[in-house]
Amino acid sequence: NVAVIGNNRPKALPVSEIDFSRLSENNPKICTYEAKWVTDSPVYLKTPPVCPADISRELEQELFSIAVKAYNALGCRDYARIDMRMGEDGIPKVLEVNPNPDISQNAGFARSAAADGLDYSRLILEIVRMAHNRYQDSEQ
């Protein structure tokens, strides 16, 4: 997935991925409820997030471009997360645009921001600042 932040010039943050390589062949390569939320489950423990993702610079730039285009096309503002999956044809597919992803301190969005050098306090302040500026602009 790619976290995106900003309004006039949205910025893609480092790509994050879930590593499914430790799952058995019987487990689907999807982030199930158990894999996402049940912290002591074997599936959770075998699907660690990797951020930044270990991908080529070329693929990273392609994912950034797709994410920002999706963000703009759907009228997102302030922040959002774009979930993607690589197709068997090697082409990234957008699965979901989440305009209100989890931004808690241990969530993926904050992890991507931290990988970009934006600590949690600054991330939250930036989101609040953008929303405040939008509100002020709408009052004029």
Features from the language model and the residues they span:
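Phosphate-binding site of ATP-dependent enzymes
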Residues: N1-E62, M86-K93
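ATP-dependent carboxylate activation and anion-phosphoryl transfer catalytic cores
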Residues: D54-Q140
